[in-house]
Amino acid sequence: MTAPVTVVGEVLIDILRSRDGDAVEHVGGSPANEAIGLARLGHPTRLATYFGTDPRGTRIANLMSREGIRLTPPSQQAPRTSTATAALDADGVAHYEFDLAWHFEMDRLELRRDEHVHTGSIAAALRPGREAVLEAVLRAREHSTISYDPNIRPALMGRPDQVLPMVERFVSCSDVVKASEDDVEWLYGDTPLPQVLDRWTELGASIGAITRGDEAMAISALGEHRWFQPPKVTVTDTVGAGDSAMAGLLSGLLDAGLLGGTFARERLRSTTWAVVQAAVARSLACAAITVSRSGANPPRRSQLPPSAA
């Protein structure tokens, strides 16, 4: 069995409005999507989060139970369950409006040794919860590997110059960092992607990944940059694509024994490109399957092509 994973971050209800105005609700939130993605790929997963006991919250709790994800206490104590309303443009790209409640009690989170801890998105960006999340990550890093996905939401996070210092603080705590090209452009302007990856490496990340939609994913590892082309698919929408990519990447690294405790961190730093490439192949396959379906609906391991399973 691979190392267990604790995901720290928000869960909410995605309200997806199609171009014809119809609305469909899905459980979402980047960290929650990543937790579901990891669980569906066979990894024991916990979610430390914050949502309500209203009907939407009950839907979330029931889904996590069905997916085999354990909620850490006190996850279900919010006054209401957060929502993100996504409207699709002509290209199927989602644009969001948020109604959020986020709070995190680090002292109530019991972190285990030799597990992997993942965080990012709104939970790692909005005060006051972000300071508690950062403290939890710093504490976990003493005995666990860390991954981070900033998943930038400009409407919520302020100006890039206000956000970048906190993003880089999380990067400096992390072994694996993944962001989208849009995230990187918002944070770093016109800085070339290889320079951004080099910056993450300087801060301490062993693997950096930048997704680029249907263009090649940029990967930094072992002192090199490489580019990996995603599979060609018919896109239904892009909701949850980056989350599935992150879950797939972590899954591949977990299977290789490169995430977990401090010994896994050393193995990650000295791995080979063949191992990294296998994890990237799973990442790209997971994202491709997700964009071919409506909403954030990551694949199960049995649905992956043999080359990525």
Q: Model regions: which residues?
A:
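Glycine-rich phosphate/adenosyl-contacting loop at the front of the ribokinase-like
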Residues: 1-70, 294
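Conserved N-terminal subdomain of the carbohydrate kinase-like
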Residues: 15, 43-126, 146, 306-309
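Short, conserved phosphate/pyrophosphate- and ester-handling motifs at nucleotide-, phospho-/glycolipid
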Residues: 38, 180, 242
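Conserved beta-alpha-beta core of the PfkB/ribokinase-like small-molecule kinase fold
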Residues: 116-198, 205, 214-216
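Conserved phosphate-binding/catalytic region of the ribokinase-like
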Residues: 1-4, 189-309
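Short beta-strand scaffold segments in enzyme catalytic cores
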Residues: 36, 83-87, 216-219
